[in-house]
């Protein structure tokens, strides 16, 4: 069954607080994220996706040396209407009792994409840019490349050989080895 705009004129948008309350009451039975007030079901993680995430997590954790912390597939808060769950986040060290890191705390967001490339390069890119994320990577598993976007202009750069976070250039990731 499909709906036309006349039959289904608008969506109900949830605030971050309402979304968190739904989770606390056990009403979200799947992996979800909140994007601009809309609850999105997250895709299952493929073995290749998980492996790439594990490798990147190890590389970033080895390079951290107390400069940042690595968050893997956990929420971040962006304003009052969004709580995405990127694959990896590099954020400043510190304690967040009762809250997730926000844009001011984050130096890099990484999304690994095997089935959601257009969404990650469209809606998610716009969300991260609008909310002040400083650097965003989309790891394109099918094309074995990484798309990098850096504030303030967020112009697309594509990397196939190696890449480093702009604020941590000493951490070099060999993409040929990563995708091998």
Predicted regions and their residues:
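Gly/Pro/Ser/Thr-rich low-complexity, intrinsically disordered segments predominantly at protein N-termini
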Residues: 1-180
């Amino acid at each position: 069954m499909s709906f036309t705009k006349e039959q289904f004129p608008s969506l109900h948008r949830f605030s971050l607080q309402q979304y968190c309350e739904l989770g606390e009451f056990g009403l979200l039975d799947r992996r979800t994220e909140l994007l601009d007030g809309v609850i999105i079901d997250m895709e299952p993680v493929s073995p290749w996706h998980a492996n790439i995430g594990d490798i990147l997590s190890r590389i970033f954790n080895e390079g951290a040396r107390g400069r940042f912390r690595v968050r893997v597939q956990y929420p971040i808060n962006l304003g009052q209407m969004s709580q995405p769950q990127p694959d990896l986040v590099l954020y400043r060290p510190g304690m967040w009792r009762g809250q997730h890191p926000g844009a001011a705390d984050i130096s890099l967001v990484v999304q690994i994409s095997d089935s959601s490339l257009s969404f990650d390069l469209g809606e998610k890119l716009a969300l991260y840019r609008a909310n002040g994320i400083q650097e965003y990577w989309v790891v394109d598993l099918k094309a074995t490349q990484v798309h990098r976007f850096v504030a303030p202009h967020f112009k697309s750069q594509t990397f196939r050989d190696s890449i480093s976070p702009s604020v941590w250039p000493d951490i070099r990731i060999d993409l040929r080895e990563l995708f091998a």
